UniProtKB/Swiss-Prot annotation:
The keyword Membrane does not apply. InterPro entries: Glyco_hydro_1 (IPR001360), Glyco_hydro_1_N_CS (IPR033132), Glycoside_hydrolase_SF (IPR017853). Its EC number is 3.2.1.21. Disulfide bonds join 209-217. It comes from Arabidopsis thaliana. This is Beta-glucosidase 11.
Length: 521
């Protein structure tokens, strides 16, 4: 199925879409050499084959089968496990330069540790090789809401520091098996959202929470568990990053005596030559603005940035949590030992930014008074989404929010390299293939990235649209869509069809859009 084989049908609509975004004066050539454009998915949302070839359940399997995503689950999803060649061909036809996907930990290591599943290993080798054959960079996420259920059952998953050992061993396996072809690694997806949804509100795996903060809570403690989970995720991320730098990236042979280097260093040099990648972490962000110009609302907005972004990035840059968090959360916030602080500080090569929406922020300091506390009372704000936005509606088009986040990361954390790992527009799955709102959204946000890069000096390295195709969504199952490609979930073959946004993105990437140059505008 060649992507542009039905371009003639879409030409009038593409022209209409271009008219709608005619004020966005930029082209692919305005971005610097080395900047990559891609799209993304995650394992449970797209692979299917949930019970095939040795894969065992993850916490997302259990979550979905408990009915948390309605009646749907990811047992089949888009069946990329069997259709990866077709999907990579569609990516190549579209002109994608990179594909962000995640590895299913429980497909590769069915027990969470120990022996590798040969069929799982073969699948990811095949996918990576197919991408490279078509000139597409593989960008790999190691954990995307899908911890092996075996580890959750054994010791409580991310609530136990035992997870640091097992995650590091899992990362080591991935670096060893795929690192000769994969140069971009994200350890954990949306650390903050995973912790809040899974351990405070109970609306994402593993669905832990406590009243009155969560919904239908049967286990958990919303007051402390989110903070414990993030603490252990940061330690696990740091451990994996240090492992990569010490065993797969840093050349150690120079310090070895020549007498033992003859036999040993040859192997070492071969290994190190192939390992030249970078390791980062992913953070969900909101573009936050004060509801009023009052001092309290401005301070509240600063707290939102501290609690959502600083919760993750502050330890990685400065070795500790933000002072506002330590003050408001108190003893419920785990403390880094001196050794742990040294380990997490600097343990990243890039920051993965995820951004969809913007917030108005109002001070609510009175929420600090109750005896029962959780993240939402600790942050002490009232937040309202900008525009007519909810998980039920299309997102408001607020590209300034992404610009704001990129500027904040630059100014607060020393302008680290950044990849936009997710950004996209939601529509009902039943909506038309003529997704003009998605075209407008993507074109606006891509221009915002260019502005942040060329006018503000943010060190942005790439942009990944979410998602490549309609997938099994965490909120809404198959009823909500972010895809460039429509997937007919009622068709046994799960037919893929390019939407208008796919044609627009393809035209942009191939340089066939005729916007005036941003540099000359």
């Amino acid at each position: 199925m060649k992507l542009l084989s039905n371009s003639l049908m879409f030409l009038p609509l593409l022209a209409l879409a271009l008219t709608a975004v005619s004020s966005l004066k930029y082209s692919r050539n305005d971005f610097p050499p080395g900047f990559v454009f891609g799209s993304g998915t995650s394992a449970y949302q797209v692979e299917g084959a949930a019970d095939e070839d040795g894969r065992t359940p993850s916490i997302w399997d259990v979550f979905a089968h408990a009915g948390h995503s309605g009646v749907a689950a990811g047992n089949v999803a888009c069946d990329q496990y069997h259709k990866y060649k077709e999907d990579v061909k569609l990516m190549a036809d579209m002109g994608l330069e990179a594909y962000r996907f995640s590895i299913s930990w429980s497909r590769l290591l069915p027990s969470g540790r120990g022996p590798i599943n040969p069929k799982g290993l073969q699948y990811y080798n095949n996918l990576i090789d197919e991408l490279i054959t078509h000139g597409i960079q593989p960008h790999v996420t190691l954990h995307h809401f899908d911890l092996p259920q075996a580890l959750e059952d054994e010791y409580g998953g991310w609530l136990s520091q035992e997870i640091v050992r097992d995650f590091t061993a899992y990362a080591d396996t991935c670096f060893k098996e795929f690192g000769d072809r994969v140069s971009h690694w994200t350890t954990i997806n949306e650390v903050n959202v995973f912790a809040l949804g899974g351990y405070d509100q109970g609306i994402t795996p593993p669905a832990r929470c406590s009243p009155p903060f969560g919904l239908n809570c049967t286990k958990g403690n919303s007051s402390i568990e989110p903070y414990i989970a993030v603490h252990n995720m940061l330690l696990a991320h740091a451990s994996a990053t240090i492992l990569y730098k010490q065993q797969y990236k840093v050349l150690l042979s120079a310090s070895l005596p020549s007498s033992i280097c003859i036999a040993f260093c040859y192997v070492l040099f071969i290994t190190q030559y192939k390992q030249h990648g970078s390791v980062g972490i992913s953070v969900y962000t909101y573009g936050a603005v004060p509801l009023t110009n009052s001092v309290k609302d401005k301070q509240a907005t600063a707290r939102v940035n501290d609690f959502y972004i600083g919760w993750i990035l502050h330890p990685l840059v400065f070795g500790d949590y933000p002072e506002t968090m330590k003050t408001n959360v108190g003893s419920r916030l785990p403390a880094f030992t001196e050794e742990e602080s040294e380990q997490v500080k600097g343990a990243f090569d890039f920051v993965g930014v995820i951004n969809y929406m913007a917030l108005y922020v109002k001070d609510n300091s009175s929420s600090l008074k109750p005896n029962l506390q959780d993240f939402n009372t600790d942050i002490a704000v009232e937040m309202t989404l900008v525009g007519n936005t909810s998980i039920e509606n299309e997102y408001a088009n607020t590209p300034w929010s992404l610009q704001q986040i990129l500027l904040y990361v630059k100014e607060t954390y020393g302008n680290p390299p950044v990849y936009i790992l997710e950004n996209g527009q939601m529509t009902p799955h039943s909506s038309s293939l003529v997704d003009t709102t998605r075209v407008k959204y993507l074109s606006s946000y891509i221009k915002a990235v260019l502005h942040s890069l060329s006018r503000k000096g943010s060190d942005v390295k790439g942009y990944f649209q979410w998602s490549l195709m309609d997938v099994f969504e965490l909120f809404g199952g198959y009823e909500r869509s972010f895809g460039l490609l429509y997937v007919d979930f009622k068709d046994p073959s799960l037919k893929r069809s390019p939407k208008l946004s796919a044609h627009w993105y393809s035209s942009f990437l191939k340089g066939t859009l005729h916007h005036p140059s941003y540099a000359s505008s």
